[in-house]
């Protein structure tokens, strides 16, 4: 039969010599096999010299040669969990000794996804953790651990190399060795009320024992968006036909401030004007402008604009990293320098980040005292004024702006001091702003952030398995914004005069 002969490594003797029902026995090189019964016994037809492969969940698989008619096989409890070390708030523990809900994500899993932040890379890699991406370059993802716990702030606490912080921004994902996600209430015993929404413990890379390792890594790629939305937008003629039929089946005489309607519902005739005239303009000469005290609004030539394709383009993404690390029995060090750049598929928008990280530690006093530090400096720059948190953002404008309207008025690109953009100040054209004009005018906006994050620590070994550690951490963030509000005379609800910085 098969019995468990050893439960060493701290598990105790409670399972010693207990039968293992349901274990699998196979003859190597064949499909012949069987399983053990409730008492751990089995019968299998095998020849002398055959090798049996014996396996059981949680135990080390063993190969046993057939010698004689009777075999008693002992399996040792697998030590897989014992070899997994998890970083928690108090320090490190064997995974099998942890009673709380902890999920570990290794660096290889994170780096399989090229992303701006490690919170974006976490998506789909930890049960009970929900990630909602910002969808803008440099935007931080919204992380929720086991749902919402309050109507207020539900963000988890981040602990980066021992420094608690509320923001994972500016952290280079390539610097991360592993992540531990503490999901249950036990985290509050370490970090208090700050851990009410869970804790994400980030451990950065350290030097490995051996000779100095120097490496350079880079990648280049690009992001694309579909040429059309899932449901392609109507062109100018299709929209005109739709408006004609909408009026007709509503019991009204089809009419529109721009289109000309004739024909029948079965064969509607839609005429598109040569020019779109602003409300109040004389439709006499294409060079005429409508003048009011606070607005100058140009006549525009009718178009058939696909606004989605106008606002999007292929966007490159680039990453460069230099890394040097090394260690011996007494000390270790690791240094990285990284540059990351990402353009948005939405035109005139981008993000770039530069980071430097250094950590080192050394043992003194006959290895009874360890001294070390972790330092990170980063500077990131968000370019352009696109945001997706308002009704009037450019992407929503792409499907609300009328296809009759071109990007520019009859003066053309740069034809006047305000860009020469066309607008919707005309009958039945809505009040939406020109989304391309908005992105173009905001392309010089900047949001820069400098961050210094790190700590210094000392750890004393008092006795075997007893240590005391103290650390001093800091997280300093400085921000600088450039926000230019330029005139937008073509916008129905815009103000022609106001300019601010």
Where do the PLM segments sit?
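Outer-membrane beta-barrel transmembrane strands
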Residues: 313-331, 338-340, 436-483
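A beta-strand signature from Gram-negative outer-membrane beta-barrel systems
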Residues: 73, 125-127, 173-215, 312, ...
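Extracytoplasmic beta-strand/coil segments of soluble accessory domains associated
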Residues: 43-45, 119-161, 177-178, 188-208
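Short, small-residue-biased leader/transition segments that mark boundaries at the very start
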Residues: 1-15
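Surface-exposed loop/interface segments of Gram-negative outer-membrane beta-barrel transport/assembly proteins
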Residues: 96, 208-303, 344-349, 355-453, ...
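Short, acidic, small-residue-rich periplasmic hinge/interaction motif at the N-terminus
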Residues: 13-16, 21-29, 51-60, 67-111, ...
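Periplasmic plug
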Residues: 97, 141-185, 211, 217, ...
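Short, acidic Ser/Thr/Gly-rich low-complexity loop/linker segments typical of extracellular
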Residues: 31-41
């Amino acid at each position: 039969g098969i019995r468990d002969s050893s439960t060493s490594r701290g598990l105790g003797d409670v399972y010693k010599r207990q039968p293992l029902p349901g274990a699998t026995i196979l003859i190597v090189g064949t499909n012949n096999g069987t399983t053990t019964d409730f008492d751990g016994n089995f019968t299998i037809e095998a020849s002398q010299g055959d090798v049996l492969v014996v396996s059981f969940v949680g135990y080390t698989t063993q190969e046993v040669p057939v010698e004689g008619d009777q075999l008693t096989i002992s399996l040792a409890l697998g030590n897989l969990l014992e070899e997994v070390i998890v970083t928690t708030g108090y320090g490190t523990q064997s995974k099998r000794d942890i009673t709380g809900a902890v999920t570990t994500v290794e660096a290889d899993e994170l780096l399989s996804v090229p992303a701006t932040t490690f919170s974006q890379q976490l998506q789909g890699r930890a049960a009970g953790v929900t990630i909602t991406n910002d969808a803008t370059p440099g935007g931080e993802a919204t992380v929720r651990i086991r749902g919402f716990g309050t109507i207020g702030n539900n963000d988890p606490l981040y602990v980066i190399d021992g420094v608690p912080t509320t923001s994972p921004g500016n952290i280079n994902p390539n610097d991360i060795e592993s992540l531990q996600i503490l999901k249950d209430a036990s985290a509050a015993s370490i970090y208090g009320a700050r851990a009410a929404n869970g804790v994400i413990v980030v451990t950065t890379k350290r030097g490995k024992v051996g000779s100095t390792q120097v490496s350079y890594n880079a990648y280049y790629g690009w992001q694309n968006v579909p040429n059309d939305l899932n449901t392609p937008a109507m062109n100018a003629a299709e929209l005109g036909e739709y408006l004609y039929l909408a009026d007709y089946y509503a019991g009204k005489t089809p009419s529109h401030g721009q289109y000309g309607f004739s024909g029948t519902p079965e064969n509607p005739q839609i005429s598109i004007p040569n020019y779109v005239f602003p409300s109040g303009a004389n439709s006499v000469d294409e060079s005429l402008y409508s003048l009011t005290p606070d607005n100058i609004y140009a006549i525009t030539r009718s178009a058939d604009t696909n606004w989605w394709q106008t606002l999007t383009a292929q966007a490159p993404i680039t990453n460069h990293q230099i890394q040097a690390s090394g260690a011996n029995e007494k000390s270790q060090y690791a240094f990285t320098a990284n540059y990351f750049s990402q353009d948005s598929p939405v035109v005139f928008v981008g993000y770039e980040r530069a980071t430097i990280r250094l950590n080192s530690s050394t043992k003194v006093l006959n290895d009874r005292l360890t001294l070390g530090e972790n330092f990170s400096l980063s500077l990131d720059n968000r370019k352009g004024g696109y945001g997706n948190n308002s009704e009037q953002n450019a992407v929503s404008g792409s499907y609300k702006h009328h296809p009759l309207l071109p990007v520019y008025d009859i003066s053309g690109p740069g034809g006047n001091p305000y860009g020469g953009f066309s607008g919707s100040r005309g009958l039945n054209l809505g009040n939406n702003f020109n989304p391309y004009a908005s992105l173009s005018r905001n392309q010089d906006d900047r949001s820069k952030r400098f961050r210094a994050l790190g700590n210094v620590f000392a750890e004393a070994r008092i006795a075997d398995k007893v240590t005391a550690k103290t650390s001093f951490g800091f997280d300093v963030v400085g921000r600088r914004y450039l926000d230019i509000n330029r005139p937008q005379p073509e916008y129905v609800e815009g103000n022609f005069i106001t300019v601010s910085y």
